[in-house]
Structure formats: C-alpha cells, structure tokens
Design a protein with these regions (language model features):
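Metal-dependent phosphoester/phosphodiester hydrolase catalytic core
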Residues: 1-154
Length: 154
C-alpha cells in the first residue's frame, strides 16, 4: 500500500493503527476473508520492514463483521487472528480476557503520555437504527435510553 511508503519515510517514534487495519469481513467459520486480508497486510509490512513500533486496535473490518458488536459469534476467532498478526505476547493481558482494549504509556521529552485503545466492538450492544435515516436530527443511529447496554463492557 503506497501510504505505508510515506509513513516509513517519516522519522516516527510510534505509529498507531486505530482500526480497519485490514478489510476482511467474514461470516464463514474459518474466517477465510479475514485470514487472507491479514496475510496480504503481512506481506506489505514485511516488505517495508518498519523501524518504529506500531500499536493497534481493531474496528469493524478487522473485527470481521461490518458494524458488528458483541453479537458477532466469531469474535474470539477474529481476536486470535488479530493477536497473532500483531505478535502480541502470551503474557499480555489481552490474551487472557475478553476484548482488545488496552493502554500504553510512553515517555516523551520528559513527560509520560498515556494512550488508551478502546475496543468499541467486543462489548457493544446492537445499535438502534433511526426511523428516518438522513433526516435532520435523525442520524444513522440514535441514542437508546437503556443504560444497561454497554460499549466498553463495564
């Protein structure tokens, strides 16, 4: 992907991949589309041999289901593919709990910077579609008053 050539040319301390890192929506048990998307991206990354760390979180397309939430029955298999692709170590907390949310703390010019990666897929309840999509004040999805529903799993 040409964008990665531009990114590689920069002098970066860290690069954040904030989701939709691959496009592999899958409904088949074997997640072939998602596997193929990760394989293709791995080839891109291997060619570039990045010389800076990359941290990542997923969104719907690397989760495996367009606009998916907690209802996606293949989310744990998708998570395994994500962890494997990003080479997340076995002692990382993400390997032992639901979801991929995490934080990193980086020191930069004498200051600590905390970066939070929110998993807005694993725990998210179904969205309530608008009754009049496109109308002013009727965005694609509207708030739902049930406070027991979650996005972050708490």
């Amino acid at each position: 992907m040409p964008i990665f050539n531009t990114i590689k040319a920069e002098s970066l301390d860290l690069f954040l991949m904030m989701g939709d890192n691959v496009y592999g929506n899958s409904t088949s048990e074997n997640l072939n589309e998602l596997r193929e998307a990760y394989d293709k991206q791995k080839q891109n990354f291997d060619k570039l041999d990045f010389d800076f760390p990359i941290e990542a979180i997923w969104d719907d397309n690397d989760y495996g289901l367009g606009d998916g939430g907690k209802e996606y029955y293949l989310k744990e298999k998708s998570k395994e593919l994500f962890l494997d692709f990003w080479d997340v170590s076995n002692d990382d907390p993400r390997t032992k709990r639901s979801g991929l949310y995490h934080e990193i703390i980086k020191d930069y010019e004498g200051k600590s910077i905390q970066i939070l990666f929110l998993d807005t897929r694993t725990f998210r309840d179904n969205l309530k579609p608008s009754d009049d999509k496109g109308a002013i004040g009727k965005e694609r999805y509207v708030p739902f008053p049930d406070t027991s529903l979650t996005m972050l799993g708490r």
